[in-house]
Amino acid sequence: KGNFTWATVDINVLNQYIQELRVHKGYRDTTTARKVASIKSFFGFLSENSIIAEDPTDSLGSPRVGRTLPKFLSEEDVTTLLNTAYKSGSNEGQRDAVIMELLYATGLRVGELVSLNLQDVDQSEAYIKCMGKGSKERIVYLHSKALDELRRYLRESRIALLGHRRTEQALFVNHRGERLTRQWVWTILKTYAQRAGIDPNITPHTLRHSFATHLLQNGASLRHVQELLGHSSISTTQVYTHLTNGYVKQEYAKSHPRA
């Protein structure tokens, strides 16, 4: 209507739409949740392509439906996936391997990963500062293998991929020297999963689930994993406990299977 553009859509408009679906159209929570997921994906695309300045769905809630158990990879499948990427030998392959290594080493959400800048990485202390949900900053740690590969990427492939765009601050860049998008990382995961002969339907969140599950299986405390994942409530983290049976350990390096 009138001067409508996607930029005019704000959280109030979206909440009214969700209310319309649930109250007036009688949609079930599962149906509404799927529509909310589609809306978030669409506005995420608009934001990443600079069609809108801010994503109005960042604070958009979704109906709570029955929680499904998280899908995760075995430690062996993670190793196979990473080795497949490391063997490619190209600049993109080195970058892709480091992306997957970091997703598994840190439990970062894909949106957090692609938002990282060079200054967010503290190589001397082996940690990364990231901005999570609700604009909450947290620290995630790098084991020695992940740190070594990240350093190599920064010395080699990132410089080659940047070309003439030497002032770009994004940690991960494409072949044009521009910041990678979430969709690009999804494609990377599926490509290497197919090459590795493992489930091609994995997503970046599968590595986050694998990170949490493997830490707990190897004895990390639930509170420790909650902090690393950036969960505001421990009840969110408890979904992983159905798979764990280890002794509690405090040090991340002793808990992570690739440490």
Each model region followed by its residue ranges:
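Conserved catalytic core of the tyrosine transesterase superfamily
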Residues: 1-259
